[in-house]
């Protein structure tokens, strides 16, 4: 019977794949933009709760990962009423804890007897938050289906999720086992049956997609009643179940977490009109998203710069700003760059416009450390990581509405898109879809990171071509500092100089796209030190401006028609 259901599920997935694929090529009619008031209603409205005056700080290194998972389920249950627990995972916790302290909260690292916080002293203190003093037992925190399904039970029934290794501890505290998953070899059919029975309990605008070894997000999922699953994209049968979950979500749903196969996963999410925010190691979100923030303005007022016709203009932009965990866990490349005060060069940083959801502290820190020369644009692809080539017109419209709303909220005016475009037919379809974003006054244009060629000129598949939509330019990456080894340690000064020499060979022409290049910097292979050396090797005929300035300059000086640079 299970095999028959699996076959039916696989057939359904194939039908969905074909239907969504055909729909992505239909041109669609670009409707009028939403009003400012209407835009405010399309952003995910997560429940907010007060933050307790006393914050219980659990030192993550003093409990094993299984016990830490149980504490995380308790953290989420408590945070439905009041955010009280912060688990110190290291990373950038120091800044977040200091921010809480500065806001008047007391940080408690031990109980009244001087004991560090563990299940033994947390459960008696917070037993009233656990439904019926019960727990759901799961095998361990290393098995995707076990930990995720246990947390889904926690979300629905309010029981603590407890691994086998911690069962004796909770039994000694008088807790009662309500359900046992630990002895069952779970597969997607168990998940599917649970999901079909309980799906109406979960939010429809958000999903958590999280492998077992990631410790983030599950507290937030319990607090906000978000369904958790994880499917390898190589498992086509299990993907049939995930496709059903995707299809049940509202348009432009937020997919939190991450995956093993980036392109396959983001393409699949995009086929259903959704977007991904990489956040598998985003910690304590059930508490942090409740921090009160001032209005955030990541943007800047920009006019077209005064141009020298003898110079070639480049904008240098760090990729991967869609990655919420990278930003919240230190944004190391950004902060390292601040040590190069003598550079005095404008660097553009992609940044998640919904970052306040995960860590307002990280947003505040980025703004505080921002050099006056630096600027922010959205990460790919606006509101989050999506591939609009895979979306139908109605899905692009909904996603563009959300993108405009998040950009208005964050003050950003230039967007980044990322996609895989294989041929001129795809380019024509893509160019039309850009009009959905360009219809909004607060979106001035954008840059496009185009695959293929991830390890020859990563994100530079568009070779600098420009698309105009509603008289706004969307300029594809013309060159990428992305080492073909994928290994930062393999980057040499000789290789960096070769890249600079290539840029030095580009022509000056302020009145055509030939005179402008967006240079992508891959943060996982090109360090700030390597970027500094690259800039030092650029000739006087190359001028660095921000992405915002480049978009303004192209808007003012380049004919408003789609074009490719010569000889690239």
Q: Which functions belong to the PLM regions below?
A:
Residues 29-43, 56-70, 77, 85-98, ...:
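Acidic-and-aromatic substrate-binding clefts and catalytic sites of carbohydrate-active enzymes
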Residues 249-250, 314, 319-344, 354, ...:
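Catalytic grooves of carbohydrate-active enzymes
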Residues 213-343:
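Non-catalytic propeptide/linker segments at domain boundaries
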Residues 130-144, 251-261, 512-525:
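Short, hydrophobic/proline-enriched secondary-structure or compact coil segments at domain edges
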Residues 66-73, 83, 100-105, 138-184, ...:
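Surface-exposed flexible segments
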Residues 98-113, 216-232, 285-290, 311-325, ...:
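Acidic/glycine-enriched edge-of-secondary-structure segments
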Residues 84-87, 135, 139-148, 152-214, ...:
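Metal-dependent polysaccharide deacetylase catalytic core of the NodB/CE4 family, i.e.
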Residues 2, 6-201:
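Mature N-terminal, pre-catalytic/accessory segment of carbohydrate-active enzymes
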């Amino acid at each position: 019977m299970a095999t028959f259901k699996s076959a039916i599920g696989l057939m359904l997935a194939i039908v969905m794949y074909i239907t969504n694929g055909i729909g992505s090529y239909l041109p669609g009619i670009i409707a009028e933009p939403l009003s400012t008031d209407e835009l405010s209603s399309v952003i995910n409205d997560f429940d907010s709760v007060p933050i307790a005056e006393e914050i219980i700080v659990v030192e993550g290194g003093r409990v094993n990962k299984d016990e830490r998972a149980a504490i995380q389920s308790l953290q989420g249950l408590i945070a439905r009423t009041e955010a009280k627990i912060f688990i110190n995972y290291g990373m950038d916790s120091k800044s977040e804890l200091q921010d809480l302290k500065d806001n008047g909260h007391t940080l408690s690292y031990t109980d009244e007897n001087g004991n560090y916080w563990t299940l033994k002293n947390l459960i008696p203190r917070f037993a009233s938050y656990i439904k019926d003093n019960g727990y759901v037992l799961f095998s361990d925190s290393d098995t995707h289906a076990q930990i995720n399904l246990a947390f889904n039970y926690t979300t629905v029934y309010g029981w603590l999720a407890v691994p086998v290794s911690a069962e004796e501890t909770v039994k000694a505290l008088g807790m009662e086992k309500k359900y046992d998953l630990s002895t069952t070899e779970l597969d997607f059919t168990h998940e599917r049956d649970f999901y079909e029975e309980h799906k109406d309990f979960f939010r429809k605008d958000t999903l958590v997609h999280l492998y077992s070894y990631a410790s983030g997000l599950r507290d937030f999922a319990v607090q906000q009643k978000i369904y958790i699953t994880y499917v390898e994209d190589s498992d086509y049968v299990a993907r049939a179940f995930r496709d059903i979950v995707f299809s049940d979500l509202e348009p432009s749903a937020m997919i939190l977490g991450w995956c093993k196969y980036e392109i396959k996963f983001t393409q699949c999410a995009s086929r259903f009109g959704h977007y991904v925010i990489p956040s598998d190691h985003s910690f304590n979100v059930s508490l942090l998203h409740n921090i009160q923030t001032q209005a955030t303005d990541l943007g800047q007022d920009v006019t077209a710069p005064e141009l020298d016709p003898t110079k070639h203009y480049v904008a240098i932009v760090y990729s991967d700003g869609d990655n919420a965990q990278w930003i919240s866990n230190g944004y190391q490349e950004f902060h390292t760059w601040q040590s190069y005060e003598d550079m005095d060069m404008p660097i553009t940083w992609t940044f998640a416009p919904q970052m306040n959801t995960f860590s307002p502290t990280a947003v505040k820190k980025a703004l505080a450390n921002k050099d006056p020369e630096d600027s922010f644009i959205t990460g790919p692809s606006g509101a989050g990581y999506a591939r609009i080539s895979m979306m139908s017109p109605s899905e692009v419209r909904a996603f563009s509405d959300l993108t405009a709303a998040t950009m208005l909220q964050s003050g950003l005016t230039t967007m980044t898109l990322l996609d895989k475009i294989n041929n001129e037919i795809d380019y024509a379809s893509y160019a039309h879809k850009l009009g959905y974003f360009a219809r909004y006054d607060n979106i001035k244009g954008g840059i496009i990171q185009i695959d293929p060629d991830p390890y020859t000129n990563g994100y530079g598949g568009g070779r600098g071509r420009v698309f105009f939509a509603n008289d706004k330019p969307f300029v594809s990456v013309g060159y990428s500092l992305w080492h073909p080894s994928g290994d930062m340690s393999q980057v040499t000064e000789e290789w960096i100089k070769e890249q600079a020499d290539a840029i030095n060979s580009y022509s000056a022409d302020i009145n055509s796209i030939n005179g402008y290049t967006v240079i992508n910097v891959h943060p996982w292979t090109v360090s700030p030190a390597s970027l500094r050396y690259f800039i030092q090797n650029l000739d006087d005929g190359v001028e660095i401006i921000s992405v915002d300035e480049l978009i303004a300059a192209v808007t003012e000086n380049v004919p408003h028609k789609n074009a490719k640079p010569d000889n690239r």
